[in-house]
Structure formats: structure tokens, C-alpha cells
Amino acid sequence: MKDKIGKFKNIFGGISLIEILIAVSIFAVAATISAGALMSMTDAQQKVLALRIVQDNLSYALDTMGKEIRTGSSYHCGIDINDFLATPRDCSVFPGGPSFTFINSLGDTITYRLNNNRIEKILNGNPATALIMTAPDAVIVLLSFYVVGSPANDELQPRVTIILKGTAGIKEKIKSRINIQTTISQRLIDS
């Protein structure tokens, strides 16, 4: 069969091999880019979720500590993590103290310290009563206490500054660093 110009019509119309290869290549590139973007978004979601869990946990721990410290007295900055004395003692220079002891509103001696990358609360100087205040997901690498104004008659209201540094996340790829600082002053008027 001839068309009007005199050439034969292509009765076997279709797609050539080169066209198929180009189409498959374009699809493969698009699929690879989409898969990479999906993996990246999944990692970002895991990082945000881990960070949120740890921030909520640390916020709860610091709020709990703050409420109890605020109503306490006899602030004592410990020289090591096993210093459970409740006699007033300042430590206002770097690196601060690794533990903090005070007498709470019920008359109990409370110590906060860092032990095995977790914040512990110890009642009446007995390590057997240690209450772990942070989740395993929150790895605390530094917990320092700076106490000012704890001795009587120094004309300063007792206060403690808590500095906390840690990491959130289990996988190295999605770990986030956390730095928190808070200052708490004693409610009782210092004598």
C-alpha cells in the first residue's frame, strides 16, 4: 500500500528498542531519587521522634527536681557523686559539683547525681534507695551543679544552677546533642 506521496506505510507501528531503554532508564532514575528521598525522610522522622522523647523525659526530670529543690533548704554542692552531706556548701566555679544534696520540705535528705549516664535521686544518703529519673534513651554525659548563697548570713538567696549535656537517639546517624541549663532559687528566705 502506498500513501499519497508514494512511500510505503509502516504497518508495523510501535516502539523501538532504544525508546524502551530510554523510558526504563528515566523510570529507574526517578524511582532511585524517590527511594532516597523516602529513606532520608524516615531518618529525619526517627531523629525528631527520638529527640522529642528525650526532651519530654528530661523536661519531666528537671521539673520534678526543680519543684523539690525550690521548696528545700541547706543546699550542698557535692565534691563527688557519693557526697551525701546536707550541710550548706557553695561551689560556684567550673566544673561545678557532680552531686547536689539538700533537705526537702518533708525533712528528708535528697541527693541528685549522675550515675551510669542517668540522673539518680537518693533518699537520706542511702544509695539502695536510688530512683532513676531518666529513660535509657537519654544518655546524660554531664550533670553539674553550681551552688551560690548556701551559707547563712552571706546576704545571698541560695540558688543552684544545673547544667545538663546529653545525647538523644540510639543510632549514630540520628543522634542529637542536648544542652540544658536551669537555675532554681530557694523559696525560703535566707537568714
Locate predicted features:
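Short Cys/His-centered divalent metal-binding micro-motifs
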Residues: 69-70
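Generic alpha-helical secondary structure signal
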Residues: 7, 31, 64, 116, ...
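Generic detection of intrinsically disordered/low-complexity segments and helix-coil linkers/edges
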Residues: 2, 21, 54, 106, ...
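Aliphatic-rich helix starts adjacent to a transmembrane/signal segment
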Residues: 13-66
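Alpha-helix initiation/capping motif
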Residues: 10, 47, 51-54, 153-155, ...
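Cell-surface, membrane-associated systems
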Residues: 74-191
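N-terminal leader/signal peptides at the extreme start of proteins
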Residues: 1-15
